[in-house]
Curated annotation (Swiss-Prot):
It comes from the Bacteria. Transmembrane segments: none annotated. It holds the Pfam family Ribosomal_L31. Its cofactor is Zn(2+). This is Large ribosomal subunit protein bL31. HAMAP family: Ribosomal_bL31_1 (MF_00501). GO terms for cellular component: ribonucleoprotein complex; ribosome. One of its GO terms (molecular function) is rRNA binding. Binds the 23S rRNA. GO terms for biological process: translation.
Length: 72
C-alpha cells in the first residue's frame, strides 16, 4: 500500500434505535445512529414474514396476461 493516500479509519460508536451499541471502524469518523441492527432486524431475530409473491404474480398475470397476445 502507498503511504499517505489512505483516509483516516478510526473506531466509531454505533447506536441502534433498539438500544444496542457496538464499535466498528469507519471513514465517517463520528458516532453513527442506525435504524436496524442484527439484534432487532426480523431476518436475524426469526420474526421474518413470508410474502405471498406467488399470489401477486398470478394476479398480475390474470389482469395483464392477454395484453400482449396477438389476435387471430
Amino acid at each position: 500500500m502507498k503511504a499517505d493516500i489512505h483516509p483516516n479509519y478510526p473506531e466509531v460508536a454505533v447506536t441502534c434505535s433498539c438500544g444496542n451499541k457496538f464499535e466498528t471502524r469507519s471513514t465517517f469518523g463520528k458516532a453513527l445512529a442506525i435504524d436496524v441492527c442484527n439484534e432487532c432486524h426480523p431476518f436475524y431475530t426469526g420474526k421474518q414474514k413470508t410474502l405471498d409473491t406467488g399470489g401477486r404474480v398470478q394476479k398480475f398475470a390474470d389482469r395483464f396476461g392477454a395484453f400482449g397476445a396477438k389476435k387471430a
